[in-house]
Amino acid sequence: MQSGRQKYIRNFSIVAHIDHGKSTLADRLIEATGTLTEREMDTQVLDNMDLEKERGITIKSQAVRLIYKRNTGEEYTLNLIDTPGHVDFNYEVSRSLAACEGAILVVDATQGIQAQTLANCYLALDNDLEIVPVINKIDLPSARPEEVKQEIEDVIGIEAEDAPLVSAKTGLNIKDALEAIVNKVPAPDGDEKAPLKALIFDSYYDSYKGVVCHIRVKEGAIKEGTEIKLMNTGKVYEVVEVGVFVPNYMPVDELKAGDVGYVTASIKNVRDARVGDTITEAKRSANEALSGYRPAVPMVFSGIYPVDGAKYEELKEALEKLQVNDAALSFEPETSIALGFGFRCGFLGLLHMDIIQERLEREFNLDIITTAPSVIYKITKTDGTLIELTNPTNMPSPSEIKLMEEPIVKSSIITPSDYVGAVMDLAQNRRGIFKDMQYLDTTRVSLNYEIPLNEIIYDFFDALKSRTRGYASFDYELIGYKDADLVKLDILLNADVVDALSMIVPRERAYAKGRNMAQKLKEIIPRQMFEIPIQAAVGAKIIARETIKAMRKDVLAKCYGGDISRKRKLLEKQKEGKKRMRQVGSVEVPQEAFMAVLKTEE
């Protein structure tokens, strides 16, 4: 049932492909409703991290309250929830969408529908949201709004005839977008007298307030002093403050069903207020939690080590600080013979990994070495025990393995039809299994493949972009595990295994990969005073070898003529010395070597 107050509330989010102008449109809406003064307007208000502004991407979800006055004099409260657009943060997007009744689908008038437009749009449809298409960038000379409207109708199957045509950059027709939100997005409902149910769609740590939870109240009301309980963790807290974002904090007396705002309750750690959890009253609690909660599961693992071993404690502190704000980051200590003490970290995906590494270097001034990323393999041993393997170094010997499974993703690639051959070739090289293809229009094709996650984890995206001149877009989701014939490839330097360079590869590729890595390392590792053999091995079998020749002094320079036996004696003596050096010498592996191993060519 709707109250009169709820009739004037609209909760919506904006979904789009990367760079279609989502955050810019949000800025224009904020400006058009006069939420911030000209002076306070900063480009991309909702992206607060420097890293977000620089890369032009949204990493954390944000929310802001806009007051829109129609010409008829009615006042509407619009709650805009800005979501990350990247596939790594899919779960955050789905929780932000669950807090809304409608979604604005921003489509670039020059590019049309892209892979993530589709992925995010289907995510919104899964949450039963009303979708309002908005066509952006119509100020560009290459804009083709009519074709894009047709494309939205054909591909997604939603009405786009009267979609507002806007330019978020110049602020053209922003009023039309606001009108479309009011007219098309349904008002929230929910009983204000029922027991409290509120969805946490984001939470982060504020050094003064503790953990701040962004919430959407579904039923009931919440105010200062209420004793609340988090349904999935079972913990009880007392509310210190409730309020709304304008985009800065503005405390209010209470939030009722249909409202979006924030709540603080002296929670110390983000892990206690997980995204997707349900807040209810401790004394009068709801019968069941809101559906859709799942803990964040890392998909990609990588070792992070300080370049200077003495900085281990600093790295640990830095990771702990990042974890306070990022419940999806996990880490545990590990040691490597080659790199010393460090941490095995788990991430949601490659972008997440990249961002964490960059934040460690920027915000904490740490020099770090990262090892090749790996995924979680499931191994059934011969004695029937099941293990999950995140670090290739810990792989059991082949005689103990009965079955080994690797994660598989369903990927959709949208590419201009001229490049279909190149894209198919790339997907097949990466052990992709072709599922289906459909033409979106005369020039663009959507290809669906099942590809092992291990194959797209490093440079698949770069390779895809370079083969399609940057035109292809890519989106993936994990669908399950499949058994595979995999082996552990070890690299030996001077007959010692360098554990940080070990990797898991398909058996049929082991030889080529080993050969390739040995050649790469030969170019990168500096010459020493003694000869260094570089070997690639699977188990005890050496499959490839390269040798870095020793630097040597010309010991015969002082012999002019004379007897050959004199020269031989000097050469033998040098040879003995080199042999001794080789036994005691150790080889330093430069950071470039780790990076090069990742970038082995196709």
Curated annotation (Swiss-Prot):
Catalysed reaction, written as an equation: GTP + H2O = GDP + phosphate + H(+)
GO biological process, alphabetically ordered: positive regulation of translation
Broad EC category: hydrolase
Enzyme Commission number(s) from the entry: 3.6.5.n1
Domain tr-type G: 7-189
Subcellular location: Cell membrane
GO molecular function annotations of the record: GTP binding; GTPase activity; ribosome binding; translation elongation factor activity
Keywords carried by this UniProt record: Cell membrane, GTP-binding, Hydrolase, Membrane, Nucleotide-binding, Protein biosynthesis
Binding positions for GTP per the UniProt entry: 19-24, 136-139
GO cellular component terms attached to this protein's record: plasma membrane
Record keyword Plastid present: no
Main location class: membrane
PANTHER family linked to this entry: TRANSLATION FACTOR GUF1 HOMOLOG, CHLOROPLASTIC (PTHR43512:SF4), TRANSLATION FACTOR GUF1-RELATED (PTHR43512)
Family the UniProt entry places it in: Belongs to the TRAFAC class translation factor GTPase superfamily. Classic translation factor GTPase family. LepA subfamily.
Name by which UniProt lists this protein: Elongation factor 4
Organism: Clostridium botulinum (strain Kyoto / Type A2)
